[in-house]
């Protein structure tokens, strides 16, 4: 009775998440219970997020990428994710090639948050992605994609950009929607 914090997910947040994700009320309630157990204060810090993310990629170094993912979803810049931000992150990073996922991908690559992506930002994110690829898979990559620099160069060439050019959000989304090879370059799908 003296506990002022409710352990139940508010109806308002539940309805918002049901409307904006593919998750059912039961799934959201179950995930909320787990989130509350892991994060009793209702927030997850970047280091905790990195640890959890690392569990999905045990044979690689996903911490750098996890940091960028965390930054892209910490919409209020408070250094934590609440349950709503966490579920949106799960939804967008696990769904297919949707417009929303591509908006998120652009925000991931837009490291300095200036509304444009530079080649150095592309290289920074691709380097973080590359560290998630286990060594045995890296050895099987095509010659023109077997290093972060080569992948960044290939991506930049798809967009027909010079070294100092920038990519705007609409151009990024259109390019990825029209070319599956670009999608493959900007993410890592672990082999089953």
From Swiss-Prot:
GO terms for biological process: regulation of signal transduction; visual perception. Probably binds two or three calcium ions. A lipid is attached at residue 2 (N-myristoyl glycine). Ca(2+) 2 binds at residues 110, 112, 114, 116, 121. Ca(2+) 1 binds at residues 74, 76, 78, 80, 85. One of its GO terms (molecular function) is calcium ion binding. Belongs to the recoverin family. Keywords: Calcium, Lipoprotein, Metal-binding, Myristate, Repeat, Sensory transduction, Vision. It comes from the Eukaryota. Seems to be implicated in the pathway from retinal rod guanylate cyclase to rhodopsin. May be involved in the blocking of the phosphorylation of rhodopsin. This is Visinin. Ca(2+) 3 binds at residues 164, 166, 171. CDD domains: EFh (cd00051). The keyword Repeat applies. Residues 24-59, 61-96, 97-132, 146-181 form the EF-hand domain. Retinal cell specific protein. SUPFAM superfamilies: EF-hand. InterPro entries: EF-hand-dom_pair, EF_Hand_1_Ca_BS, EF_hand_dom, Recoverin.
């Amino acid at each position: 009775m003296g506990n002022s914090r409710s352990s139940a997910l508010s109806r308002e947040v539940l309805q918002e998440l049901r409307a904006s994700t593919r998750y059912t009320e039961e799934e959201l309630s179950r995930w909320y219970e787990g989130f509350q157990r892991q994060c009793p204060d209702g927030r997850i810090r970047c280091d905790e997020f990195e640890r959890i993310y690392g569990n999905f990629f045990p044979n690689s170094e996903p911490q750098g990428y996890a940091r960028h993912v965390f930054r892209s979803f910490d919409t209020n810049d408070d250094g934590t994710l609440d349950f709503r931000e966490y579920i949106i992150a799960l939804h967008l990073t696990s769904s297919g090639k949707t417009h929303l996922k591509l908006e998120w991908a652009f925000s991931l690559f837009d490291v300095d948050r200036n509304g444009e992506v530079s080649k150095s930002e592309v290289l920074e994110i691709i380097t973080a992605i590359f560290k998630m690829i286990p060594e045995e898979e890296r050895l099987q990559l095509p010659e023109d994609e077997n290093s972060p620099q080569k992948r960044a160069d290939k991506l930049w060439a798809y967009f027909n950009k010079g070294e100092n050019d920038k990519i705007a959000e609409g151009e990024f989304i259109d390019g990825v929607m029209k070319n599956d090879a670009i999608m493959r370059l900007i993410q890592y799908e672990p082999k089953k």
